[in-house]
Design a protein with these regions (language model features):
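Amphipathic alpha-helical polymerization modules
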Residues: 1-137, 177-273
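Cysteine-poor, low-complexity segments in flexible/peripheral regions
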Residues: 139-181
């Protein structure tokens, strides 16, 4: 089969156009860092890219929730620590008040100190955060999603710390009144006070557990976020090594096609002469 000069010419033109397009595309990928220009370039990759973008927005939400819960639990822990210190001092004062040689007048003085400690505990229990929200929340306490399938309580409730089991302020008020009257705290008073301390300590333990769970969830979410970003990069970002190799190859093929065209032009010129 004989191939005409026109067929060779047309083939060379098509080859030049294709290689020029390949060069331009490789240059675009390298300069933009994006593997695809339009979603239609690879519908599957585009669809997966949308899913990955949604996943990234989810991890951004997790980060906001993590920061919120961390700030809340940090404030909770600080208030519980202050309450525990005040209660321990109150308990020590009760032990002192049970000392028989102390006398009625000295117990009344202890009653004044007990009132100051009770007021301090009340202030700690009703403290507010920087946003004006009570650190010990009204029940029920809300939860927040801090990692995939991981929800944590955002705080502790006031009732959980101050009311459930023993009413902390009521117990303190009763004992303070006993001391203010010059009387010695009873065995029941001592038992109630120990129960109050146990109740607050239990709240501290729970806060610590929530903080540990938050740390673990934050670390897990960060690892998953990194994996999602890696998937996105592998799917949508330019592979510089591959794109550079493609550019070199396409440039070489384009130059070869241009050389063929030049020879065709020369041959055509000689034929005309």
């Amino acid at each position: 089969m004989r191939i005409s000069s026109q067929q060779v010419f047309d083939s060379s033109v098509q080859s030049m156009q294709q290689h020029t397009s390949d060069v331009v595309e490789a240059q675009r990928q390298i300069s933009s860092g994006q593997k695809y220009r339009l979603a239609s370039d690879d519908a599957l990759a585009a669809g997966l890219g949308v899913q990955i973008a949604w996943d990234k927005s989810q991890f951004a939400m997790f980060k906001v929730n993590q920061d919120h819960v961390n700030a809340s639990l940090t404030s909770t822990d600080a208030q519980l620590n202050s309450i525990n210190i005040a209660l321990t001092k109150f308990q020590q004062m009760m032990v002192q008040g049970r000392n028989d040689p102390l006398g009625s007048d000295n117990r009344k003085l202890l009653g004044q100190q007990a009132m100051a400690l009770k007021n301090a505990v009340s202030q700690f229990a009703n403290a507010k955060d920087a946003n004006g929200q009570s650190i010990f929340r009204a029940a029920p306490v809300s939860t927040a999603l801090v990692a995939p399938s991981v929800s944590l309580e955002t705080a502790l409730s006031y009732d959980e710390v101050m009311v459930t089991g023993q009413n902390v302020l009521s117990v303190m008020s009763g004992i303070q009144a006993t001391l203010a009257a010059g009387n010695s705290p009873t065995d029941t008073d001592m038992a109630n006070m120990q129960a109050v301390l146990t109740q607050v300590t239990r709240a501290q333990v729970k806060t610590g557990l929530l903080q540990n769970q938050l740390d673990a969830a934050t670390e897990s979410a960060e690892v998953q976020k990194t994996n999602v970003e890696l998937q996105r990069s592998n799917l949508l970002d330019t592979d510089l090594a591959t794109a550079t190799a493609s550019l070199v190859k396409s440039n070489a093929l384009l130059q070869a096609a241009q050389s063929v065209m030049t020879k065709l032009d020369v041959n055509t010129l000689f034929q005309k002469l």
